[in-house]
Amino acid sequence: DGSVTYTPNDNYHGADSFTYIVTSGGVSESTMVNIDVTPVNDAPVATNDNAVTDEDTPVTIDVLPNDTDIDGDTLSIQSASVPSDQGTVEIVDGKLVFTPAENFHGDAEITYTVTDGSLTDQATVNVTVNAVNDTPVVESSLADQTLAEDFTPYSIDLNTAFSDVDNVDGELTFSVSGNSNVLVSIENGIATISPTADWNGSEALTFTAADPSGESVSQTVNFTVAPVAD
């Protein structure tokens, strides 16, 4: 139809020209066309990142160095988010600070948006959170015991007195120390307390819970056995 279509190269802007030739009746004439290609802002390109941290340990992630903008615009982080069960993320001094949720370990995925001040792009950061062994804790305090001489044997459930977020019931090992006359046997976390015949007095018993890694916690219970007339 006699029209000419000019298409600049990708992302080119500036001066350009082309020459076209018109032929009529065997006579040709060339004409140069000057073109000014005005710049148009291009969106930045955000690139995915990876990071590693330990359980309960915040990590600072510099995500911008591998993000690009062909126009040379200065990039910044506009926003960032992470599922709440995995942790929290903040933007601090142009970097992401990820704090894992308490006792969380595994893979966390942060989504962030980078901007050149006008246009944006999104990328993700995969954070590998390494598991760290947690020490068992005292879940409930064992009360001091006041008993009568030759008391009837009874039991204390150590599974409810101690807990470990890393281990389910049955994975803690229980022990007792400090007893000579208050007899204790422990099976499946149940401590059976028995008397020594005709004994009375006081003893401080220390119950200890240890996890498979050897980390442990203890609590002491004072046993007082009152004399009874025979």
Task: State where each predicted segment sits.
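Feature 14080 marks short, conserved micro-sites in well-ordered regions
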Residues: I35, V127
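A structural signal for beta-strand boundary/capping segments at domain termini and interdomain linkers
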Residues: A15, S28-S30, D107, T120-Q122, ...
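Short, solvent-exposed loop/turn segments at the edges of extracellular beta-sandwich modules
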Residues: V22-V27, V114-L119, A209-E215
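Strand-loop-strand motifs at the edges of beta-sheets in extracellular beta-sandwich domains
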Residues: D1-D10, F18-T19, V82-E102, E109-T111, ...
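Calcium-coordinating acidic loop motifs
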Residues: Y12, F104, G117, W199, ...
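Short, solvent-exposed loop/turn segments enriched in Ser/Thr/Gly
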Residues: H13-F18, T57-D62, H105-T111, F151-D157, ...
